A protein has these predicted regions:
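Cytoplasmic-side transmembrane-helix entry/capping segments in multi-pass membrane proteins
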Residues: 438-441, 461-472
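Structural signature of hydrophobic alpha-helical transmembrane segments
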Residues: 432-445
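Hydrophobic alpha-helical transmembrane segments in multi-pass integral membrane proteins
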Residues: 474-490
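A structured beta-alpha segment of the ubiquitous adenosine-cofactor-binding alpha/beta core
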Residues: 56-71, 78-79, 227-257, 261-274
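Rossmann-fold NAD(P)-binding glycine/threonine-rich loop
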Residues: 100-128, 266-318
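Adenosine-phosphate binding glycine-rich loop
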Residues: 3, 120-121, 126-163, 170, ...
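Structural/interface elements that position substrates and couple domains in central-metabolism enzymes
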Residues: 2-111, 118-149, 153-160, 166-169, ...
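Glycine-rich phosphate/diphosphate-binding loop of Rossmann-like nucleotide-binding domains
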Residues: 8-47, 159-250, 407, 425-427
Length: 530
């Protein structure tokens, strides 16, 4: 039986996103589902009802009709009590739920015998789950938008300029927290020309900050900040004191501070105190991306932009929604990947398989039974390294060298003598043309070995352009063999049928390598073009 996927209008305040977009509707229909969208659901993201109709969806007039008919409901925000009341008993809900923060909502959904997949509970340590990771998608959009909001509230350029009217210094941006949102903010601010500094409790993100054009500011306190599931952990009091001292110093120098620090299931840590705000330069800006969880700044007002001590503090809780079309497109794609995992048979039905670690982590309620929190994922245990073999007491005289040791001078001399004798015999009895070809063959083997095997493995892909050049040399050699003789003297040395066949084969294989290599290289370079 084909299931109906319903997409309601989001009722949360200032929420403009929609759980699916017309392009994704077409893909859901190809999976065998029917799709219904509430009228006006996509208006905030600039998707009209006609766009959904064109994609094949049914447009439903009322929320009650949509919730009552839908087998699967796709949402962005957690459902309200009124929406839970409309949810059909035994149906499936997919979207943000935040089970740790919403225990009452969990009880209401369980009472409906619903199956609930919380996109925020996805195990982010699973590499194959990245395609479903809506938290990362929304955090990237929010980090970008945070810089845009900061630029709007800031009274100067981001980049430095020298004009006839005088010199304009670049803005100094400090980003607290270098997760997905923080890295997006760093890249955006650096792209606008600002001087960007950033800090995070996880020291391993320093290279990522530098790669985006920022400077990593380290806290003068030794403590590892990585927590489970790819998140940061709560730090010790000693670390927090050292961190506050560093933040106080940065606040005096920064023009813009963007805070992104969050700890799952807990209120946002207070990083920026009122005293730090007071020490900032007039006209400075703070964008607190943790406003929905209480804020990283003591003076943040969630959902509003306020001015305190001459500093604008932006506490908007709908940063991703302020880029509604982009956010909706990314979020809809994430949910599509979830549906694809649930509907591997592509028959318009779903199977919530608890043997799948990603689906097990997503599922917080199954048929009315609360299954959250999920059991920890069993990480594969690395095989123990084999014990080192005992070092031989003496080198083996039979081979001239021990294990891993270079050849002795005597053995090396013998090898060269044998090689010279072989060349002498070849030169004595083989025709002159064979000797010339054989010499070129030996040199080609040597050059090929030096070119390929002496290159670091990580550079093999960039080496593709060099192999294309070498392939062209081989192609020219094959063409010389295949080409007709230019005179009677040359006709006498024309290669036999076997040599011609080998030359044609070499030319064919080389052409495949050349054209294929250039095609792949072109695709690689296209990834870096804007």
């Amino acid at each position: 039986m084909t299931l109906l996927i319903g997409v309601p209008l989001e009722t949360a305040n200032e929420e403009r996103r929609v759980a699916t977009v017309p392009d994704v509707v077409e893909k859901l229909i190809k999976l065998g589902f029917s799709v219904a969208v509430q009228s006006g659901a996509g208006t905030g993201a600039n998707f009209s009802d006609d766009d959904y109709r064109t994609a094949g969806a049914e447009v439903v007039a009322t929320a009650a009709d949509l919730w009552g008919r839908s087998d699967i409901v796709l949402k962005v925000r957690p459902p309200s009590s009124e929406e839970v009341a409309l949810l059909r008993e035994g149906s499936t809900l997919v979207g943000f739920v935040w089970p740790a923060q919403n225990p009452e909502l969990m009880q209401q959904l369980a009472a409906k015998r619903a199956t609930v997949l919380a996109i925020d509970s996805l195990p982010r340590t699973l590499s194959r789950a990245q395609k479903m990771d809506a938290l990362t998608s929304m955090a990237g959009v929010s980090g970008y938008r945070a810089v845009i909001e900061a630029a709007h509230a800031f009274g100067r350029y981001f980049n430095g300029q020298i004009t006839a009217a005088g010199k304009v210094p670049p803005a100094k941006v400090f980003v607290a927290g270098a997760g997905v949102a923080g890295l997006a903010a760093i890249g955006t601010a650096a792209g606008l020309g600002a001087i960007v500094r950033a800090n995070d409790t996880r020291a391993e993100v320093a290279d990522q900050v530098k790669s985006l054009g920022g400077e990593f500011v380290k806290v003068d306190y030794e403590e590892e900040g990585s927590g489970g599931g790819g998140y940061a952990k709560v730090m010790s009091e000693g670390f927090q004191q050292a961190q506050r001292a560093m933040y106080a110093q940065q606040a005096k120098d920064a023009d813009i501070i963007i805070t992104t620090a969050l700890i799952p299931g807990k209120p946002a840590p207070k990083l920026i105190t009122a005293e730090m705000v007071q020490s900032m330069k007039p006209g400075s800006v703070i964008v607190d991306m943790a406003g929905e969880q209480g804020g990283n700044c003591e003076l943040t007002v969630p959902g509003e932009a306020v001015v305190r001590h001459g500093v604008t503090i932006v506490g908007y809780t709908d940063l991703a929604s302020r880029l509604a079309r982009q956010s909706s497109t990314l979020y809809a794609t994430n949910l599509l990947r979830v549906i694809e995992e649930l509907c591997k048979a592509k028959d318009g039905t779903i199977n919530v398989d608890f043997n799948d670690d990603a689906i097990r982590g997503l599922t917080v309620i199954k048929e009315g039974s609360v299954t959250w929190p999920p059991p920890p994922i069993q990480q594969p245990v690395a095989a123990p390294k084999p014990a080192a073999a005992p070092v031989a007491a003496a080198a083996s005289k039979g081979h001239g060298h021990g294990s891993g040791e270079p050849m002795s001078a005597k053995s090396l001399a013998i090898v060269f003598a044998v090689g010279a004798l072989a060349f002498l015999l070849v030169g004595q009895f083989a025709p002159a043309t064979f000797l010339a070809h054989f010499t070129v063959f030996v040199l080609a083997c040597f050059v090929g070995y030096m070119v390929i095997w002496n290159v670091t493995p990580s550079l093999h892909t960039p080496l593709m352009s060099v192999t294309n050049a070498i392939s062209s040399i081989i192609a020219i050699g094959a063409l010389v063999q295949v080409a007709p003789p230019l005179g009677e003297a040359a006709a006498e040395g024309r290669p036999s049928g076997l040599i011609l066949g080998l030359a044609v084969g070499a030319l064919t294989l080389t052409a495949v390598n050349m054209f294929g290599g250039f095609a792949v290289t072109r695709r690689m370079l296209a990834m870096f073009r804007k």
